A protein has these predicted regions:
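Acidic/polar, glycine-rich intrinsically disordered N-terminal extensions of enzymes
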Residues: 8-9, 13-78, 84, 232, ...
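Conserved helix-loop functional segments at active or binding sites
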Residues: 14, 38, 58, 62, ...
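Short, intrinsically disordered low-complexity segments
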Residues: 12-15, 186, 289, 320
Length: 321
């Protein structure tokens, strides 16, 4: 079974028409080693190639899909997972969608940090329009993820992260279940729900969790990751303010909904953002952890993409920053 899996998904083949496989797994291992060390000095190169081949062909080193399936092809990309964060603007959302398509096409799994998008009904341009909510944009990201087949190796996949206190969280928790319609479900991504100590304290003490739109409480979303004391101060102050749109829900009810959806649908991850920052390799005040990857297994600092600039000149293609 393993041989068939490697041969059908990782070996070079004619994926468009006949499906003919052009190499065996051992040839693939040799080509990977030869490609990776092709720029090394000629006197040392073969020794490195052989040592690396011996390590990967005997499974002492496990290779991620982009390396295993694509590093010996013209489209070389070494990142197995890419973390992409969006801000609360159309330019940033479009830049994120563009980046998702680019990296999915290069066989990467995607982690999307999308918790900062304002909630449905929020004012846009000082009330010139009202926000449609996060679900239409999650659908956009889902379409971007599923737009490429990754060369027939595997379908695109992504996990999208948002905080448990987001104003739309009750609708977000059910995005994967089989109830509802296509209009209010986004089933083909996975989700990571983000918690911190304050949320657990509300649960343990039988308290409530107050839901906000991130846009309505400046600094709340950033401090959720970078400074727990500041987050608690802003959160409790916002709870007392009558001018801020909010919704209060018993913590036990919200946690129960999360657990039920996680049990029923699978792959709804729990991310403790305070522990991710205090127990990691990065300084939270300088480079806070704001999301994880496709499998919710790594912590790397991110910053939101600002916008994509598209050029029509022959000298420039696309710039995301």
């Amino acid at each position: 079974i393993g041989l068939c899996l490697v041969g059908s998904e990782m070996c070079i083949r004619d994926s468009r028409t006949t499906g003919e496989i052009f190499e065996t797994p051992q040839v693939a291992y040799m080509m990977i080693a030869a490609t990776l060390f092709s720029k090394y000095p000629a006197k040392k190169r073969m020794a490195y190639v052989k040592a690396y081949y011996d390590a990967i062909s005997t499974f002492k080193i496990s290779l991620p899909t982009p390396v295993m399936a694509g590093v010996r092809t013209p489209q070389r990309q070494f990142s197995s997972c890419v973390l992409i964060e969006t801000d609360d603007s159309l330019d940033s959302i479009n830049a994120t969608s563009s980046a998702v398509v680019k990296y999915v096409s290069q066989k990467a799994g995607i982690g999307i940090g999308a918790g900062n998008i304002r909630a449905i009904g929020s004012a846009i341009r000082s009330g010139d329009a009202t926000h449609t909510g996060v679900i239409p944009f999650y659908k956009l990201f889902q379409s971007a993820v599923k737009s490429c087949s990754q060369g027939g190796v595997r379908g695109g996949a992504a996990t999208l992260y948002y905080p448990i206190w987001h104003l739309e969280v009750e609708d977000l928790l059910v995005l994967k279940n089989n109830k509802g319609t296509e209009d209010n479900r986004v089933r083909h991504m996975d989700y990571g729900v983000q918690f911190n100590k304050l949320m657990y304290e509300r649960l343990i003490t039988g308290g409530n969790i107050t839901l906000f739109s991130p846009k309505d409480v400046p600094g709340l979303y950033d401090s959720f990751f970078a400074d727990q004391d500041t987050f608690k101060e802003l959160y409790e102050k916002a709870e007392r303010m009558t001018s801020i749109r909010k919704k209060t829900i018993p913590a036990i009810e919200l946690f129960s909904n999360f657990v039920q959806e996680r049990k029923d649908t699978g792959r709804i991850y729990l991310m403790n953002v305070d522990h991710a920052n205090t127990h990691g390799a990065f300084i939270e005040e300088v480079a806070p952890i704001r999301q994880s990857n496709l499998c919710c297994e790594i912590n790397l600092p991110t910053k939101p993409l600002s916008h994509c600039l598209l050029y029509t000149s022959d000298a420039a293609d696309e710039l995301c920053r």
